[in-house]
Amino acid sequence: MTKERTFIAIKPDGVQRGYVSEIIGRFEKKGFKLVGLKQLIPSKDLAQNHYGVHRERPFFGDLVDFISSGPVVAMVWEGEGVILSARKLIGATKPLEAEPGTIRGDLAIDIGRNIIHGSDGEDTAKFEIDLWFNEEELCEWYTSDSKWRSEN
């Protein structure tokens, strides 16, 4: 397994409901390293670019309106297998199908208010990280316990 980066965003419903620290804590407890963090209210342009793959879908406008309706906590996490692990931590897109113990399984009810976004692959992660962050906003740093997290 290789060290990789992924983009995670706590959506306006997750921020408004006070889940920021709990969600960050779940990623830290898993052993991933936070290398980028900021809170912003996304512009319509940013939201449209982020969800561009859904542009032709009937829910696109509502999705853009929602994600730009309030503060989003945008993050970049780093670690071995972080993309797949993050998807497992987050749970199924439809909260009622998400397993207990996942973020959506524990905290969300409605697909339109499912609290969190996570990149679904390496190409998507790179695109989303580059869209939301400038290179100078990402911190290269080393944890003092990194030798206890993995063999490599």
Swiss-Prot record:
Entry function: Major role in the synthesis of nucleoside triphosphates other than ATP. The ATP gamma phosphate is transferred to the NDP beta phosphate via a ping-pong mechanism, using a phosphorylated active-site intermediate.
Identify the main location. Answer: cytoplasm
Give one GO biological process term: GTP biosynthetic process
Can you tell which superkingdom this protein's organism belongs to?
Bacteria
Q: Which UniProt keywords apply?
A: ATP-binding, Cytoplasm, Kinase, Magnesium, Metal-binding, Nucleotide metabolism, Nucleotide-binding, Phosphoprotein, Transferase
Question: What protein am I looking at?
Answer: Nucleoside diphosphate kinase
Catalytic activity, as annotated: a 2'-deoxyribonucleoside 5'-diphosphate + ATP = a 2'-deoxyribonucleoside 5'-triphosphate + ADP; a ribonucleoside 5'-diphosphate + ATP = a ribonucleoside 5'-triphosphate + ADP
A Pfam family recorded for this sequence = NDK
- Species, as recorded: Prochlorococcus marinus (strain MIT 9312)
Question: Could you tell me which HAMAP family the record lists for this protein?
Answer: NDP_kinase
TM region(s), chain numbering: none
Q: What class of enzyme is it?
A: transferase
Catalytic site: H117
* Similarity section: Belongs to the NDK family.
Q: Where is it located?
A: Cytoplasm
**InterPro entries per record:** NDK-like_dom, NDK-like_dom_sf, Nucleoside_diP_kinase, Nucleoside_diP_kinase_AS
Task: Report the EC code(s) recorded for this entry.
Answer: 2.7.4.6
Q: Which GO terms describe its cellular component?
A: cytoplasm
Q: Gene encoding this polypeptide? A: ndk
Q: Quote the subunit structure annotation.
A: Homotetramer.
Q: Does the keyword Nucleotide-binding apply?
A: yes
GO MF assignments: ATP binding; metal ion binding; nucleoside diphosphate kinase activity
Q: Where on this chain does ATP bind?
A: K11, F59, R87, T93, R104, N114
Cofactor(s) it depends on: Mg(2+)
Q: Which residues form a coiled coil?
A: none
